[in-house]
From Swiss-Prot:
It is an enzyme of class 3 (hydrolase). Preferentially expressed in bone marrow-derived mononuclear cells at the sprouting front. It comes from Mus musculus. This is Tubulinyl-Tyr carboxypeptidase 2. Interacts with SVBP; interaction enhances VASH2 tyrosine carboxypeptidase activity. One of its GO terms (biological process) is positive regulation of endothelial cell proliferation.
Amino acid sequence: MTGSAADTHRCPHPKITKGTRSRSSHARPVSLATSGGSEEEDKDGGVLFHVNKSGFPIDSHTWERMWLHVAKVHPRGGEMVGAIRNAAFLAKPSIPQVPNYRLSMTIPDWLQAIQNYMKTLQYNHTGTQFFEIRKMRPLSGLMETAKEMTRESLPIKCLEAVILGIYLTNGQPSIERFPISFKTYFSGNYFHHVVLGIYCNGYYGSLGMSRRAELMDKPLTFRTLSDLVFDFEDSYKKYLHTVKKVKIGLYVPHEPHSFQPIEWKQLVLNVSKMLRADIRKELEKYARDMRMKILKPASAHSPTQVRSRGKSLSPRRRQASPPRRLGRRDKSPALTEKKVADLGTLNEVGYQIRI
């Protein structure tokens, strides 16, 4: 998960000293001024975390802000920070080798190799997300960020793991990838988490990173998408989290140079207000439509359409009218009315003319 109030006093990630590779000449004071950069801050579960927007090498402001946060949340605080930053010698951090696919490998073995690589990078407990992920950025740009992850070999969080998983599974057309997002509630706070759903040869699984082993990767053993989602929901219950919403995106194309952004939430289910039978029904309809490649990104410049509850989008049930692109579908009890896109700026081939 991207944040947890119960985990704010965990020991920082042992790879925290990796920052010295990028900026070895940083000053080492423990007492620092606060950031105040609200555009580089976010909250999840009531816990503040920062995002490195300076790239690499990390600039001094981001570097000092990270250490200040660690000093606040670590049980030993400034003592631990000072011991690391003022040490005369620090062991050189290991750089894991990026996995390479071999023809002798099965798909489950390949996915396990990717997940093991992510685990070697380890989960980022520093309170600073090292790689900025803008969800609406084109896929080609996000793949460049994934390359940077392999070069820097720094700890990552769940959103970074999704992008890295897409990058490492590119070129395997038998593997379909799509994001699965969760919004949960615990102890008065809301939490957000995302994993990379996997579909291959009739089975579902996932790749990802989390503080909790049960909330990241899942093997390719689930016959249906609903079985996979329910397994995550059951895992959340072990930590007393109530799943409020589940968002499913579209398949991510195996085209690393695509300018199309990832569709993160084509289907939105307000699961806390639905029966499991209804959740399963909606998920299986959606999974069938994804497999048949009927669904289209809501970001396309064309009229949008919301599927009504219980209505299929399979070819045998579609009307004879010309096909229309589908918009994001929200399965909450109250559906807000979608506005039809303005076609005044579209030319004859469907491209929008920017003025």
